């Protein structure tokens, strides 16, 4: 009896001692089965014919929504010479647009976040040693973005630039002149609609949710399209979640089966909610837009300060049948 008890205790301690090893494999998700599933889906998308919409190729591995699939399809279709990316606003990089690209395709990249805790977390991961990744801690502003990009020592033409800083996205993208990405992924705020050229006013230390509602940030799709057109890019659509817009350098559009589309054609109203009422209940449909009514924005056509006209945006989206629910 005592012998059996000793054996039982010994076995339990053996399992306890394996916990750090198990945790190690869970943390280092580059070995995760979901990477293999992403590889299978990416291979399947190569054989799809007649792709006319980015939604047709979406899948998710590490991206917040279906952007991993869109990115994989684009890099398989486009003859991108330099396999490099820059992504900022990555937090701890567990959920990001370029993580699967790094692990699956061995691209080289620079990621930037304003939190030292997040950057230290990235640097402590195995992927920081196993792949060609640089992580920089900096709160991005118009005055430092080009210097931060230059520090990566990439060629001027890079593969992907992913912009998602929940605030000054338009102003930072406008300022960038040290690289010419083949693909630009830029977050937009669908609550501004597709017709209005709106962005929040620039503020060096803007932090989402500090001075205004949490859902008040970034720029409209229209403003992002106008800006990238001036930089030599065509708009090809948005992800199904309604938060990321995709732009392709004009020289590369010919390699894709999907055409350049207008803001109205490519606009997607966000499926998620980032606005709540006083009781903490999530706002849906038109109520999300009303939550930012009359807040100050910059008209990127005129440079003048305007106020968000929620009802005008709602009417526009209803007429275009762009809202799933009212």
What positions do the PLM features span?
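N-terminal auxiliary segments of SAM/dcSAM-dependent transferases
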Residues: 7-43
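Rossmann-like AdoMet/SAM-dependent catalytic core
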Residues: 28-79, 83-86, 94, 148-149, ...
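SAM cofactor-binding core of SAM-dependent methyltransferases
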Residues: 55-163, 190-193, 276-281, 285-288
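Short, structured coil segments at secondary-structure junctions
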Residues: 104-105, 179-180, 231
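Short, hinge-like loop/turn segments at secondary-structure boundaries
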Residues: 127-130, 152, 179, 202-204, ...
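Conserved hydrophobic/aromatic beta-strand scaffold that supports enzyme active sites
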Residues: 160, 183-185, 244-248
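A short, conserved alpha-helix within the catalytic core of class I
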Residues: 167-180
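Conserved beta-strand signature within the Rossmann-like core of class I S-adenosyl-L-methionine
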Residues: 181-192
